[in-house]
């Protein structure tokens, strides 16, 4: 079964863990580059989807770059409405491949990350990340795709799973996220192998705190 992973540097951190946990029954592909923000991912799909074999399953996320505060005067890098518009378009293009789609919520940052103002490095606020997660989940509510709630699993003990840079996962975080992604992929793969005529797949790891 062929799997395509799409995302930013968080995806790049957990990629090897996903490959290890999926084993030889799955071929895992991903762009070599960082998927960055939603508009960049949307534009890049024109090239990425031609670069790899047609996938059976696609697991994707964008959001950390979109919620980044590059300059304190400007707020989030992309407005939530533009983020949602881009994510809808990304989902449309991914669905057109015929693959089973899994969407992952954006992961939290350390509470201290808000204090890093200015152009380098950007600041993030968990309230913004949660707000963008809610917005995209509301937009995807009728799309009938599984949700892998990485935010919900990581947020309660985020400091345990974050590295010193306060945004990327440490070893424990890689194990957590990689395990969740691999498990979601296996469950969707098994589900559709056994019930290929079913109308919908179950939601995965969905935490109510994300959408409140």
Regions from the PLM with identified roles:
Residues 25-42:
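A short beta-strand-loop structural module common to alpha/beta enzyme folds
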Residues 21-24, 42-212:
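Alpha-helical cap/lid subdomain in secreted, periplasmic
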Residues 14-26:
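A short, Lys/Arg-enriched amphipathic alpha-helix followed by its capping loop at the start of a domain
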Residues 1-16, 37, 67:
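Catalytic nucleophile-elbow at a beta strand-turn-alpha helix junction centered on a G-D-S/GDSL motif
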Residues 8-11, 34, 167, 174:
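Short beta->alpha junction loops/turns
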Residues 5-8, 34-37, 79-80, 124-125:
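Short, flexible loop segments at the rims of nucleotide/cofactor-binding pockets, characterized by
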Residues 6, 31, 104:
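The conserved SAM/SAH-binding core of class I Rossmann-like methyltransferase domains
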């Amino acid at each position: 079964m062929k799997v395509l992973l799409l995302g930013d540097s968080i995806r790049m951190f957990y990629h090897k863990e996903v490959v290890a946990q999926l084993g030889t029954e799955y071929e895992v592909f991903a762009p070599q580059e960082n998927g960055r923000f939603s508009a960049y991912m949307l534009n890049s799909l024109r090239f990425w989807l031609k670069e790899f074999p047609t996938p059976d399953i696609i697991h994707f996320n964008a959001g950390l770059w979109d919620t980044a505060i590059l300059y304190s005067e400007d707020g989030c890098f992309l407005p939530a409405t533009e983020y949602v518009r881009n994510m809808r378009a990304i989902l449309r293009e991914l669905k057109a491949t015929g693959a089973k789609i899994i969407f992952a919520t954006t992961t939290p940052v350390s509470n201290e990350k808000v204090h890093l103002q200015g152009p380098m490095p950007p600041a993030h606020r968990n309230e913004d990340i949660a707000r963008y997660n809610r917005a995209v989940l509301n937009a995807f509510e009728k799309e009938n795709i599984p949700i892998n709630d990485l935010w919900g699993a990581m947020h309660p003990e985020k400091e345990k799973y974050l590295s010193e840079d306060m945004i990327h996962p440490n070893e424990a975080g890689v194990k957590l996220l990689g395990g969740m992604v691999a498990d979601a992929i296996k469950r969707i793969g098994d589900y559709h192998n056994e019930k290929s005529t079913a109308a919908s797949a179950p939601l995965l790891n969905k935490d109510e705190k994300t959408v409140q």
